[in-house]
Amino acid sequence: MKILSLESSAGPASVVFAEDGRIRAAQYQDVGSTHSRTLLPLCESMLSNAGLSYADADLIAVSAGPGSFTGVRIGIATAKGIAFGTGAKCLAVSSLLGLAANCADLEGMLLCPCVDARCGRVYTALFRVENGFPRRLAEDQILPISALADFCAEPPMLLGDAAEAALAALPGARLAPLALRTHHAVGIARAAEHFAADAVESDLLVPVYLQKSQAEQTRLDAEKKN
């Protein structure tokens, strides 16, 4: 299967074209640019340099959150646009599973992705690498960093942009190498290979936020006061 995967749920933006488990092309950028300006050009540059086209992809896999509200929306919209033009199906992949899949070679390791959810909280989950793939132990959720010690049954390896902040709350935990704890479309592609049967038509692709955006929460708070 040929998979075009997109990751824009956090600071970096990356794209990967994978075929039958092999990465044929990839591009990554983390220079603070708005994903709306970078994600599609990254795709087009990668495909052009590799002699590929959007039509070559059987599946469009995208990081559907949790993470940056804007980044997730941009990724979903980009995936839908590509799929609409090619007829390919889409797959929403948890950004936390994507992080864990970066570490699929660390057999037996307990993995705890921690992505900044603001206000001293993180988006998190738990995975154990078994037979070369992270098996989910806990669903994606929001927790205060202070609650992570109770959440983890044993010291885990930490991933994600809040991994360093979480380290102080988890005695015995350790950071994954930077290249493995950073959001990358390689992890999205790896996860997509395992869950390709769950692919849907592009109009059914939806983001996963886990909480309201700051703007939405502010509006709701104002409505309650009125």
Where are these regions (language model features)?
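N-terminal beta-alpha supersecondary unit
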Residues: 1-64
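Gly/Ser/Thr-rich beta-alpha loop segments that engage phosphate groups in nucleotides
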Residues: 13, 34, 65-69, 73, ...
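A glycine- and small-aliphatic-rich helix-loop capping segment at beta-alpha/alpha-beta transitions
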Residues: 19-23, 76-86, 129-131
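Surface "functional belts" at beta-alpha junctions
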Residues: 22, 28, 34, 89-183, ...
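Phosphate-handling active-site elements
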Residues: 48-55, 84-93, 105, 109, ...
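DPxDG-like acidic metal-binding loop motif
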Residues: 59-89, 95
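Acyltransferase
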Residues: 134, 177-226
